[in-house]
Regions:
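N-terminal export and membrane-targeting signals
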Residues: 2-6
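A residue-identity detector for tryptophan
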Residues: 20, 108, 260-263
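Active-site-adjacent loops and short helices of periplasmic peptidoglycan-processing enzymes
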Residues: 23-189, 196-200
Length: 269
């Protein structure tokens, strides 16, 4: 279901001919060869999804889509915006990978997926980033949000201002990790805009999304993006589970990167 591929194929046909007659007068030029018929554009694939979009990163052209502006629950795809802001802070010199962050009770008590950071213990920004991206740890994500903005509520305001700047018109964030909330929503189109901005603005940090595993506190966890193992053309970004199961990935075909965002019809069994 994840491996529907869309590729563009270009080709050129070159025909060259020269003819000289034995007589002094030159033969008239041959009529130009007829241009080959245009390649038909394939129809969009049948995908078991409520909403999806496939966008060419280089041109921002939408290659295929279904209900791409329908409002969806982002779940842990929210962490893409949190990471985007963390990378902003790093690039601007306001944050360093070696900075230490003391884990608050709010971060430590967070629900859902965890990096298993310890209450009151300092953790490096580097390890928190790995915990957020590789393990999808809500605790690591909230710790980073609090380090940048003081509180998670204030950080959500920063998320929404960035969403507005990126023209994510169908998105509103209420927290940094993606825990359910009535006014916490996005669209497949908006997530494709965020994915493209991530790759474009912070290529030096995008490598985090291809790391396969991370160990913290003696607990080793695999990257939750199973496409890294299943498809060698996928170089990163994020799945989201459990409800609704969704993903944002960056497959590369013929040296071309695409942003692929989808929400499944039903949660996995």
């Amino acid at each position: 279901m994840y491996r529907h591929l869309i590729a563009s194929i270009s080709f050129a046909t070159l025909i060259a001919a020269a003819c000289w007659a034995a007589a002094p007068a030159a033969a008239p030029p041959a009529a130009p060869a007829a241009a080959p018929p245009a390649m038909p554009i394939p129809s969009a694939p049948q995908v078991d999804a409520r909403s999806y979009i496939l966008v060419d990163y280089q041109t921002d052209k939408i290659l295929a889509a279904k209900e791409a502006t329908a409002r969806m629950e982002p779940a842990s795809l929210t962490k893409l915006m949190t990471a985007y802001i963390v990378f902003q802070e790093l690039a601007g010199g306001k944050l360093k990978l070696e900075d230490m962050v003391t884990v608050s009770e709010h971060a430590w008590r967070s629900e859902g997926s965890r990096t298993f950071i310890e209450l009151g213990k300092p953790v490096s920004v580097q390890d928190l980033i790995l915990g957020m991206i590789v393990q999808s740890g809500n605790d690591a994500t909230i710790a980073l949000a609090e380090r940048i903005a003081g509180t998670e509520d204030t950080f959500a305001q920063l998320m929404n201002s960035n969403a507005k700047r990126l023209n994510m018109v169908g998105t509103h964030f209420e927290n940094s990790s993606g825990l359910p909330s009535p006014q916490h929503y996005t669209t497949a189109r908006d997530m494709s805009l965020l994915a493209n901005a991530m790759i474009r603005d912070f290529p030096q940090y995008y490598k985090y999304y291809s790391i396969r595993e991370f160990e913290h506190n003696g607990i080793k966890q695999q990257n939750r993006n199973g496409l890294l193992e299943k498809d060698p053309s996928v170089d990163g970004l994020k799945p989201a589970t459990p409800i609704p199961p969704a993903s944002v990935s960056s497959p590369r075909r013929i040296a071309r990167a695409c942003a692929w965002c989808r929400w499944c019809s039903d949660p996995p069994a």
